[in-house]
Amino acid sequence: MRTIRAATEHLFGLGWKFWRLGICKAVVPLQAAWKAFSQPVPASCNELLTQLLLCVSLASLIAGLAHHWLVSLQLYPLGPPALVTSLCGLFVFLSLGLVPPIRCLFVLSVPTLGSKQGRRLLLSYSAANLAVAVVPNVLGNVRAAGQVLSCVTEGSLESLLNTTYQLRQAARELGPASRAGSRSLTFEVEGKGSAFRLHMHTITQEILEDFSGLEFLARAALGTQRVVTGLFLLGLLGESAWYLHRYLTDLRFDNIYATRQLVRQLAQAGATHLLTSPPPWLLQTAQPKLSREELLSCLLRLGLLALLLVATAVTVASDYGAFLLAQAAVAWAQKLPTVPITLTVKYDASYKVLDFILFVLNQPPVESVFASMQRSFQWELRFTPHDCHLPQAQPPRVTAALAAGALQLLAGATLVLQAYAWRLRHTIAASFFPDQEARRLSHLQARLQRRHNQSDHLNKQPGTMATRESRKPGQGTRTLESQGPQAHDSLGPPYDLE
């Protein structure tokens, strides 16, 4: 058993070692590509080629996404979006290749998706996806069910009127024979069949017009959603630009991270004691942790997103329900049989002369036939007319529903990863502007040094006041408490980034 256990542990150790080795080998080219992409001026031909290749790839990706957004999702025609996306891709390539801050701004927009503006963009795109694909599909299936009902109603009405007409024809052909027997046979329909048909047609048209109104509202909502999505996208880029501007102009902005570069700088200066008791606002980037308040805020916002997921699930369920309803209605209408009807009318008229004498003589009566007629009438009962087209049920848009749900789940994930997104933005900006990051680290080191000197000064004050305590007991404690929490950190809390 010990041998098997040792062999298993050895295999797990080798597997973990090879896994780490593979990860390290995979990270090396990624680090080289990131270094080339973040360089303002490439240092070699390899970095230049890598930078151009990345710029072309990103420009193609942006152009492809824009074309998909304009054509496939937002229902634009095929002509203008192709030209617009081509010009957009060329502009993005030139901007990324020639202007390094634009590259930084583009990369900063990725972690900015974890902010409130990014969540709004994701949720807006999700709602647009549902409005384009799922809602019209639901309305189309409900309209198909209404069209089936209209066809069956019209066919049943025509069959009823046709039956009445055939009975009237039978009564008309039996007219001479029935008049010979001093009786008449008539069939009438109370009311006008044309008026009833017109009334049913009017009701059906009103129902279809109601659904057309809903489709118009859906298209109007789609147009509004296009504008809102564009505004959110501009807001996302604007927030990234605002962060980059504050990073480059304000040394105190978002300067609350104990990075590895800061640790090395303090070690070189022999000031590692500044991190022995760090202030509460200093964040360790190597081991980021969320506070209790941040976790509670995430849970509350996740509850709101859960309600949105429930609404999306109800919409998708409505899509499936409308599809099943339309499918069942169309299948039921197609299976309605054509009922053949044959009406055979036989009419015999006879009379008897002095039948009471034959009755007294116990003789059978003698009947004289003076009129006899037999007719057959054939027609069919059709519940669906020939000229009525039965529409096909539209299957649910599974891909659109999954995409909308995935975007909403991604928006929920950004709530938890929001704190890490802020750290990632700082890391990205530091990679593109190392000189500015060096100035910011020097400012942070000076800030920590001032706080440490002030703490040492406060620690020396109780000893001084202790010499006077014999004359005025409690005076030292009151002097320390009178300085308030500002005495521990006169610089105050960091900037509130939200």
UniProtKB/Swiss-Prot annotation:
InterPro entries: CSR-E3_Ligase_Protein, DC_STAMP-like. Keywords: Differentiation, Membrane, Transmembrane, Transmembrane helix. Residues 1-51, 103-121, 248-303, 423-498 are cytoplasmic. The keyword Membrane applies. GO terms for biological process: cellular response to estrogen stimulus; cellular response to tumor necrosis factor; multinuclear osteoclast differentiation; positive regulation of macrophage fusion; positive regulation of osteoclast differentiation; positive regulation of osteoclast proliferation. It is found in: Membrane. Expressed in osteoclast (at protein level). Ubiquitous. Highly expressed in multi-nuclear osteoclast cells compared to mono-nuclear macrophages. Expressed in foreign body giant cells (FBGCs). It holds the Pfam family DC_STAMP. It is a multi-pass membrane protein. Its main location: membrane. Residues 73-81, 143-226, 325-401 are extracellular. Disruption phenotype: Mice show a lack of multi-nuclear osteoclast and foreign body giant cell formation and a bone-resorbing efficiency reduction. Induction: Up-regulated during osteoclast and foreign body giant cells (FBGCs) differentiation by TNFSF11 and cytokines. Down-regulated by estrogen. Probable cell surface receptor that plays a role in cellular fusion and cell differentiation. Cooperates with DCSTAMP in modulating cell-cell fusion in both osteoclasts and foreign body giant cells (FBGCs). Involved in osteoclast bone resorption. Promotes osteoclast differentiation and may play a role in the multinucleated osteoclast maturation. This is Osteoclast stimulatory transmembrane protein.
